[in-house]
From Swiss-Prot:
Keywords: Hydrolase, Metal-binding, Nuclease, Target cell cytoplasm, Toxin, Virulence, Zinc. GO terms for molecular function: deoxyribonuclease I activity; metal ion binding; toxin activity. It comes from Escherichia coli O157:H7 (strain EC869). The keyword Cell inner membrane does not apply. InterPro entries: CdiA_EC869-like, CdiA_helical, VENN_dom. Toxic component of a toxin-immunity protein module, which functions as a cellular contact-dependent growth inhibition (CDI) system. CDI modules allow bacteria to communicate with and inhibit the growth of closely related neighboring bacteria in a contact-dependent fashion. The C-terminal 289 residues (the CT fragment) has a strong DNase activity in the presence of Zn(2+), completely degrading supercoiled and linear plasmids, and inhibits growth. In the presence of Mg(2+) it nicks dsDNA. Expression of this locus confers protection against other bacteria carrying the locus. Pfam families: CDI_toxin_EC869_like (PF21111), CdiA_helical (PF21483), PT-VENN (PF04829). The keyword Nuclease applies. This is Deoxyribonuclease CdiA-o11. A beta-hairpin (residues 322-332) fits into a pocket in cognate immunity protein CdiI-o11 and helps confer immunity protein specificity. The inner membrane translocation domain (IMTD) targets the toxin to a specific target cell inner membrane protein (YciB in this case), which delivers the toxin to the target cell cytoplasm. Exchanging this IMTD between CdiA proteins alters the inner membrane protein delivery system but not the CdiI immunity protein, strongly suggesting CdiI recognizes only the toxic domain.
Length: 377
């Protein structure tokens, strides 16, 4: 997808093509001051690559004629239009077929089944597209699905002035159900940076990012600002948790583990020293690994990428877990529907470190592991 995005950008203008290198260079200077490009670790290069892709995609949107030009090529747009759940035209056709059938008094279940099958077949492609090309799903698929959904909400009186409207409340309900499901799927499963790229490449939003022309430094700053935002789901006091940062597992890790357990069933806790996971809720089939990372150590402040590496290691362990038994408690992969990591970090975590945390969260999604972050102050 990186190559697809950059190719669109480079086709828009020679300037944007050459600007991609500057985007990366500026990102390196902002995130890793004093570090030469040749000295970047592989994971640091991945971070820069992601930022450059977001920024370059945004730049492409500024030089192109539409949001789609920033995200995907014309062919991918064509494919999306031809292969989507129920589009505007499909919704109208379904509405007409169902309305005519009801008026004739026939058995209309075959019509409903036919269109549900079409919707399901086209919707099934979204799962793979969210893995292979999430930016296309955000830019084009979402708009087509939304078009079909919006058709159900057009008031009937518009039909009196020549505007096409749906007339069957039954058909509207089906389209809302089918397309609403796909819209939710796209929103929930799209990587966060693609949502930023779509937002930033919209002409109505570009005024906030560009003044007097294409300003590469502003675009890069915007991308970094988005990626480095604080995404903690909660903030708690250290005294409430009973933990002390930098004081070892007994005063940092264990108190946090106990705190997380307060919101889980009493029998969810696994035996001490259980492999990978600390809790298992049989009712929800959720296995939870409780972790805490002190981001304020000299090593992690000097090299924020260590934060990503630590979380990634925890994610990989949770994703690859197969089975384990200890003290009469057994846990197997077949018992697990949800794998989660409850992560605690200091409230003083830097923006650069947050960029690494957010990258790890997105990586977790790709591995089927949900990472929830709580900051402890």
């Amino acid at each position: 997808m990186v190559n697809a995005t950059l190719s669109v950008v480079q086709k828009n203008s020679a300037f944007v093509g050459s600007a991609t290198g500057e985007l990366a260079a500026r990102a390196i200077g902002m995130l890793y001051p004093g570090v030469k490009q040749s000295d970047l670790s592989e994971e640091q290069k991945q971070t820069i690559s992601t930022l450059a892709t977001v920024s370059a995609g945004l730049a492409g949107g500024l030089t192109g004629s539409s949001t789609a030009s920033a995200a995907v090529g014309a062919q991918s747009g064509k494919n999306a239009v031809e292969n989507n759940y129920l589009s505007t035209n499909q919704s109208l056709t379904f509405d007409k077929e169902l309305s005519d059938c009801r008026k004739s008094g026939g058995n209309c279940q075959d019509i409903i089944d036919k269109w549900e099958k079409i919707s399901d077949e086209q919707s099934a492609e979204i799962d793979q597209k969210l893995k292979d090309n999430p930016l296309e799903a955000q830019v084009i698929d979402k708009e087509v699905a939304k078009g079909g959904y919006d058709m159900t909400q057009r008031p009937g009186w518009l039909g009196n002035i020549g505007v096409e409207v749906m007339t069957s409340d039954e058909a509207k309900a089906y389209v809302q159900k089918w397309n609403g499901r796909d819209l939710t799927k796209i929103d929930v499963n799209s990587p966060e940076w693609t949502k930023f790229a779509v937002f930033a490449s919209d002409p109505e939003n570009q005024a906030m990012l560009v003044s007097g022309g294409l300003l590469v430094k502003d675009i890069t700053k915007a991308a970094i600002s988005f990626m480095s935002r604080n995404t903690a789901t909660a903030t708690v006091n250290a005294s409430e948790v009973g933990m002390q940062w930098g004081q070892g597992n007994m005063k940092q890790g264990m108190p946090w583990e106990d705190y997380v357990g307060k919101s889980l069933p009493a029998d969810a806790r696994l035996p001490k020293n259980f492999k990978i996971f600390d809790y298992y809720d049989g009712a929800t089939k959720t296995a939870t690994s409780v972790k805490s990372i002190d981001t304020q150590t000299m090593a992690k402040l000097a090299n924020p990428n260590q934060v990503y590496s630590s979380i990634k290691g925890n994610i990989d362990a949770a994703a690859k877990f197969k089975e384990y038994a200890l003290s009469g408690r057994e846990l197997t992969s077949s018992m697990i529907s949800n794998r989660e990591i409850q992560l605690a970090i200091p409230a003083d975590t830097t923006k650069t470190q947050w960029a690494e945390i957010n990258r790890a969260i997105e990586y977790g999604k790709s591995q089927g592991v949900k990472v929830t972050v709580t900051q402890v102050k």
